[in-house]
């Protein structure tokens, strides 16, 4: 069975944000605006997305 993935796009700048939010974006493999990253749908990734929800857009499940 294929692992579900999430497609995440960075829509906000990490400038003037807390260092932990910048590090979370790096952990999500995002470092510039409008970059898209495909990540496995795990509880840890969902938690990271929730932490920077104001800076990213989730495009949905990619099976």
Swiss-Prot record:
One of its GO terms (molecular function) is structural constituent of ribosome. It comes from the Bacteria. GO terms for biological process: translation. Disulfide bonds: none annotated. Keywords: Ribonucleoprotein, Ribosomal protein. GO terms for cellular component: cytosolic large ribosomal subunit. PANTHER family: LARGE RIBOSOMAL SUBUNIT PROTEIN UL30M, MITOCHONDRIAL RIBOSOMAL PROTEIN L30. Part of the 50S ribosomal subunit. Belongs to the universal ribosomal protein uL30 family. This is Large ribosomal subunit protein uL30. It comes from Methylobacterium radiotolerans (strain ATCC 27329 / DSM 1819 / JCM 2831 / NBRC 15690 / NCIMB 10815 / 0-1). The gene is rpmD.
């Amino acid at each position: 069975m294929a692992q579900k993935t999430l497609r995440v796009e960075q829509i906000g700048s990490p400038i003037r944000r807390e260092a932990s939010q910048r590090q979370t974006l790096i952990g999500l493999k995002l470092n510039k605006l409008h970059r898209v990253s495909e990540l496995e749908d795990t509880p840890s990734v969902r938690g990271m997305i929730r932490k920077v929800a104001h800076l990213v857009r989730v495009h949905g499940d990619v099976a």
